A protein has these predicted regions:
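Positively charged n-region of N-terminal signal peptides that target proteins for export
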Residues: 13-17
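Short, surface-exposed glycine/acidic/tryptophan-bearing loops
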Residues: 54-101, 115
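Bacterial N-terminal signal peptides
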Residues: 20-28
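Disulfide-stabilized extracellular recognition modules
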Residues: 39, 95-142
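A short alpha-helix/helix-coil micro-patch that ends at or immediately precedes a cysteine
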Residues: 30-67
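Short, Lys/Arg-enriched N-terminal segments with co-localized hydrophobic residues
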Residues: 1-12
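A short, amphipathic edge element
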Residues: 43, 84, 119-120
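Residue-level detector of short coil/turn "hinge" positions at structural boundaries
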Residues: 48-49, 73, 122
Length: 142
């Protein structure tokens, strides 16, 4: 071994280190979370939301994507939203629990406004982890 390299057949070859990223889609989300979301909306005079398969798939894809890239963003939302009927998206990072993510969104003016949109009737919610952090995605739609 020579510094950060290995000697192979008289030649010094750099040692390659590979980072393997594991992304786990976390089983999400409990009925309690939907109850919390709907209670929040109903307290503001809005109808309850129902879970949507297409919005759930969209939220799952984006949660996995954020975890794989270790980046919280809205990448892809605007190009995908029409096909799934999505109207708004909330993302979060750093919350270990569903209730933490909801509290974070309720405490943020823009995210709160999304949760109180009067023209949405359905949602998809997913969470994914990269081994260190957990990423959340809530997609709201008609």
């Amino acid at each position: 071994r020579v510094g950060n390299a290995d000697r192979i057949g008289g030649n010094v070859m750099p040692v390659r280190r590979f980072l393997i990223s594991f992304v786990t889609l976390i089983a999400c989300c409990s009925p309690t979370l939907a109850d919390s979301l709907n209670s929040f909306r109903q307290a503001h005079g809005l109808p309850a939301l129902h879970r949507s398969g297409p919005l759930q798939a969209m939220a799952s894809r984006h949660a996995r994507s954020m975890a794989a890239r270790q980046s919280m963003d809205h990448a892809g939302f605007y190009s995908e939203r029409g096909a799934a009927g999505a109207r708004a998206e909330n993302v979060a990072w750093g919350c270990a629990t569903e209730s933490c993510a909801i509290r974070m969104w309720v405490g943020s003016a823009g995210h709160r406004a999304n949760m109180l949109l009067s023209d949405v009737r359905s949602y998809g919610l997913a969470s994914a982890a990269d081994g260190r952090n957990r990423y959340w995605c809530l997609v709201l739609g008609r």
